[in-house]
A protein has these predicted regions:
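A well-structured
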Residues: 1-280, 293
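Active-site-adjacent bridging/hinge elements
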Residues: 113-115, 218-223, 265-271, 329-340, ...
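C-terminal, non-catalytic "cap/extension" segments appended to globular domains
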Residues: 114-118, 228, 357, 365, ...
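Glycine- and acidic
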Residues: 123-124, 180-189, 229-235, 272-283, ...
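Active-site-adjacent "gating/activation" loops or surface patches in catalytic cores
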Residues: 161-173, 283-358, 363-367, 471
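Long, well-ordered alpha-helical segments
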Residues: 197-208, 213-214, 218, 252-256, ...
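Inter-helical turn/loop segments and adjacent helix faces that build the functional surface
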Residues: 231-232, 255, 259, 301-304, ...
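Post-HExxH zinc-binding segment in Zn-dependent metallohydrolases
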Residues: 243, 381-410, 417-420, 424, ...
Length: 563
């Protein structure tokens, strides 16, 4: 078994890949039997496995060190030629939809495969390849700038993950100064962020126009495989957030203020992630120590998680520590040719980093279950489902928190702060998504007008927040820090929807953990075989678009916070 560092990498021959896909498309069109059609799809699947794997290896190695000149060029290569391969895949998908053997195809690959192919076929045309290449280059520009960001603080130069730790310091003055330092950085570089985002909005809007669509909102939903809900459903969900969740958060924040000895009213932005008067729970400073504890938790949780973490350890399928030049953020990817998940972290020693670790390893748990089935690459979970795997794992691993925190008091603190954070996130995440709808429904907005729209949304979704005249926050620029707005439009609502499902697993687990965990494992094993709505209903949980579905969550969480 090869370790991730040993995976071979050779730049792929894009012309050969496109030619292979073209040949398979011709074979599919000419197929006069179901078996010939299925053979063509199997061939397509195998090309996909190889291409996705080599691209994932290159991208991950680049993200680990964005200063590596070799993988910097490889990342540029995929940004340029990825859309060319995508177009060949779309053409193959169109041939599937025109095929006479749809029942036989569904029998082998599942109904959802055809549903997703229908979305893929509508996701691009030859007219937008050049625009997609430009879009990728703009995203890379944003990511590279963030990865190399240097923030002056108290005579030192810090990275973004480093400043994040200080923003939750026990010392209020340090927290405030850290928020001010981050504000200074973003204000100083505001023109850069505005110009990149403005270019992205114009680019994506032009893509939608060239494809004959009303706006990029419509195209964004297609590209996110929204196979079971619409903007109208999301609008119903938003109203529930405003009516049921925001009032609950406001009550939670009053309790929060009381805990930290601050007067009732709005909470200062630099107190929002400081949950206890005597300090947030303290965990390991070292990423190696953190990972050793995480391995123990997974080995003890269940036979499935034990086998999973043993694979991850043996292959070193993760990179945990934060360092200069590393891409900001965390994610999980799959490398199907090696049957390997890979988890990318930026551990800097905060309690929140522990949660992020379990979140990303939750994604990997799903990849682990699908690793032996080659058809998984054809039916990857849509992101709303994928985020259930990760957000629920945050709760499922709480029984092992004593391995990260020295006292039972700190374990209790971590559980409470995580619960409050997740509740608050429902409103914040919805605000991010609402902002995207406004931006892409009104692409003519200027950067200043976008900031005004964000500030208006703050009043709807975070009326409890006091920005204390810190310029970056007061002027509606906070959205610039949200990477998904730049690199993954219309992704963010998937986190929020998944959080409502994770809360339901948590609620069941408070009464019967084993039942909740087995339900979670069953859902995770199903991967992308069903739509989000169908999977949630099959699991016996409430779909968040249904009116009244969020009231139960608000009541359950508040009851726990009141204990």
């Amino acid at each position: 078994m090869l370790k991730f560092a040993e995976f071979p990498y050779v730049r792929p021959d894009i012309e050969a890949i496109v030619a292979k896909l073209g040949g398979l498309t011709a074979d599919l069109k000419a197929a006069d039997t179901a078996e010939k059609a299925l053979d063509a799809i199997r061939g397509y699947r195998d090309v996909l496995i190889d291409y996705m794997s080599i691209r994932s290896i290159a991208t991950t190695r680049y993200n680990i060190n964005t200063r590596d000149p070799y993988y910097l060029e490889e990342n540029k290569f995929f940004n340029k030629f990825g859309p060319v391969v995508d177009k060949a895949m779309v053409e193959f998908g169109e041939a599937i939809l025109a095929c006479n053997f749809i029942p036989e195809i569904k029998a082998e690959f599942g109904d959802i495969f055809i549903t997703n192919i229908q979305f893929k076929a509508k996701s691009m045309t030859a007219d937008v390849i050049e625009l997609m290449q430009e879009e990728n280059a703009l995203n890379a520009k944003y990511q590279e700038f963030n990865a190399t960001a240097q923030i002056p603080f108290d005579g030192k130069i810090l990275t973004v993950p480093d400043i994040n730790v200080l923003m939750a310091s026990d010392d209020r003055e340090i927290r405030k100064a850290a928020y001010q330092a981050l504000s200074d950085f973003y204000v100083k570089n505001g023109e850069f962020y505005d110009s990149v985002y403005d270019a992205l909005v114009k680019n994506r809007t032009e893509q939608a126009k060239r494809m004959g669509l009303k706006n990029y909102t419509e195209l964004g939903y297609i590209r996110r495989n929204r196979n079971c809900f619409t903007p109208a459903d999301v609008d119903v969900f938003r109203k529930q957030i405003a009516e049921d969740i925001v009032p609950a958060i406001m009550k939670a924040k009053q309790m929060h203020l009381e805990r930290i000895g601050q007067p009732a009213g709005k909470i200062k932005i630099y107190d929002n992630d400081f949950y206890f008067a005597d300090g947030n729970p303290k965990t390991f400073e070292s990423a190696d120590d953190m990972m050793a504890a995480a391995v123990e938790v997974f080995r003890e949780l269940s036979p499935e998680t034990r086998d999973y973490i043993n694979l991850m350890e043996e292959g070193k399928y993760y990179d945990a520590p934060s360092r200069e030049g590393k891409k900001v953020g965390a994610y999980c990817t799959g490398i199907p040719a090696h049957k390997a998940p890979f988890v990318f972290l930026n551990y800097a020693g905060s309690a929140a980093d522990v949660t992020t670790t379990f979140h990303e390893f939750g994604h990997g748990f799903n990849v682990f279950f699908g690793r032996e089935n080659p058809n998984t690459v054809l039916n990857n979970s849509t992101l709303d489902i994928a985020e259930i795997h990760s957000m629920t794992m945050e709760f499922m691993t709480e029984g092992g928190l004593h391995k990260f925190f020295k006292s039972e008091e700190d374990v209790a603190k971590q559980k409470l702060s995580h619960l409050e954070h997740c509740l608050t996130f429902l409103a914040y995440g919805t605000m991010v998504d609402h902002f995207q709808h406004i931006v892409y429904d009104n692409p003519e907005l200027t950067p200043a007008q976008r900031n005004e729209e964000w500030r208006k949304l703050e009043n709807i979704y975070r009326p409890f927040m006091d920005f204390d005249n810190i310029e970056y926050y007061e002027t509606g620029r906070t959205w610039q820090r949200q990477q998904h707005l730049f690199s993954a439009p219309f992704y963010y609502i998937d986190y929020v929807l998944a959080q409502t499902i994770a809360f339901q697993f948590w609620a069941i687990g408070t009464e019967d953990f084993e039942k909740s965990f087995r339900m979670y494992v069953d859902l995770t094993k199903k991967g992308g075989r069903y739509t989000f709505v169908d999977l949630v209903r099959q699991t016996g949980l409430r779909v968040p678009f249904e009116e009244g579905s969020l009231k139960f969550i608000a009541e359950k969480v508040m009851a726990e916070l009141n204990k």
